[in-house]
Amino acid sequence: MQIKSFLLAAAAAPAALGAAVNTIKPFNCGTDAPSRQHIQMTKELAEKEAAMAAEGIMTAQATINVNVYFHVVAASTALSDGYVTSTMINNQVATLNKAYAPHNIQFTLKGTDYTINSNWAVDGSELAMKKALRKGTYKDLNLYILKDLGDALGYCYFPTSVTSKSNDWYYDGCSILYDTLPGGSLTNYNLGHTSTHEIGHWFGLYHTFQGGCSGNGDYVSDTPAQASASSGCPTGRDSCPSQPGLDPIHNYMDYSYDTCYEEFTSGQRTRMTSYWNQYRANASV
């Protein structure tokens, strides 16, 4: 069974009527812990990466090209019901490309479809929705833009071994709260970086605060240890003072404000490439 990764809002804002209005949702991390199986996969990839680096055989990675299918699932054709515009979608793709380009990852919008379904729009009947809407192969990214995810801003699934048309194959992809797209109404989280963050999980990354101050953390050697998720943009935060480095508050895999996000690390780039090559690059179904 795959693992769903959540960004949780601590308080729900009242639903807007008519045109969308600015809302504020402070949020906490509610991510399910990676399974033992997935952690073992990550450990094995980390060991391979370290061995290759020690032998000096790390090679330049060709650009990873990801086809993206947007599925806008709304309760009506009103923006406040999740019916985002094509401009918001195009701006979201541009945001992703700006964030991932330094790591040789490129996203191409391959298609957008709109569905009016009040149940699916609030994350009801997830598997049925995805069986009806999913497109492409396991190397193609499906983004489901929904009106409401309960307390969540978004969730995604880690890469793993799947067979075509299995439930795990259908579940793959990310569900994103509509007003986190660029131009959305969610204060502090409306520049499109909820998607940037969630797609990091789609590439196999954990949160920077995975594991806290002890152990292997997120299994990436160049992300400083972090006791818990950040809130806002707390410059100088050092939640693991006995460990090297300040908290990586600007890292896309923390939970900072969108305006605070700036980077993935070199180690995260290597990990995304490893997971891509292992599970997605050669997918034909």
UniProtKB/Swiss-Prot annotation:
* Keywords assigned by UniProt, alphabetized: Disulfide bond, Glycoprotein, Hydrolase, Metal-binding, Metalloprotease, Protease, Secreted, Signal, Zinc
Q: Which CDD domains match?
A: ZnMc_pappalysin_like
Q: Where does the secretion signal sit in this chain?
A: 1-18
Positions bearing carbohydrate: N282
What residues form the catalytic site here? Answer: E198
One BP term from GO: proteolysis
In terms of InterPro entries, this protein maps to: MetalloPept_cat_dom_sf (IPR024079), Peptidase_M43 (IPR008754)
Provide the E.C. number(s) assigned to this enzyme: 3.4.24.-
* Gene Ontology terms for molecular function: metal ion binding; metallopeptidase activity
Q: Which cysteines are joined by disulfide bonds?
A: C233-C260
In this chain, Zn(2+) is annotated as bound at H197, H201
User: Where in or outside the cell?
Assistant: Secreted
One GO cellular component assignment for this chain's record is: extracellular region
Q: Is rRNA processing one of the keywords?
A: no
- The top EC class, named as a word, is hydrolase
Keyword Signal listed: yes
- Top-level taxon of the source organism: Eukaryota
Question: Can you tell me which family this protein belongs to?
Answer: Belongs to the peptidase M43B family.
Q: What does this protein do?
A: Secreted metalloproteinase that allows assimilation of proteinaceous substrates.
Official protein name in the record? Extracellular metalloprotease NCU07200
Query: Which species is the source of this protein?
Result: Neurospora crassa (strain ATCC 24698 / 74-OR23-1A / CBS 708.71 / DSM 1257 / FGSC 987)
